[in-house]
Amino acid sequence: MTAAVAEPRIVPRQTWIGLTLAGMIVAGWAVLHVYGVYFHRRGTLTLEIAPAIVAVQTRMSVGHKNVAHDAMHGSLAPGRPRLNAAVGRLTLGLYAGFRFDRLTTAHPAHHAAPGTADDPDFHAPVPRAVLPWFLNFFRTYFGWREMAVLTALVLIALFGLGARPANLLTFWAAPALLSAL
């Protein structure tokens, strides 16, 4: 006699907790992003405030990746694949214009062979060097479509919404890049 395989139990509380935490990360990131990019002005407190904002934004950017990772595994909102995909798309899009579907397709290969030449998230030729890994990661996941989306967002921020270039680099680009390390 074979034992029946039980279906995973969908836990509404887990979904609520996951979505609440994801919402807090996205909202916190958005508030700091809007302040830093559009309202922060150089002044007497810049040296004290700007590094703190960059540090928190960097952590929030890591949070975007963590939320997307949970969404890829379906653990953000168990039993709700479309909701997981929607939240994953939002967080990766805000993070750096990455396509959730592209990363989700390659992600199982990472778990199948972590830290090996077959791991798309690992740079086997020079495993301890950050720059070659970083460039390899971007070549793997950041294509022309992502570049077009990111370029459009930057142009809208600069010319449509009046963001200062230094603020965009400091409070959006720098935290996103730092969070990848």
Where are these regions (language model features)?
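Membrane-proximal soluble regions of multi-pass membrane proteins
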Residues: 78-133
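Alpha-helical transmembrane segments of integral membrane proteins
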Residues: 16-24, 48-53, 84, 166-170
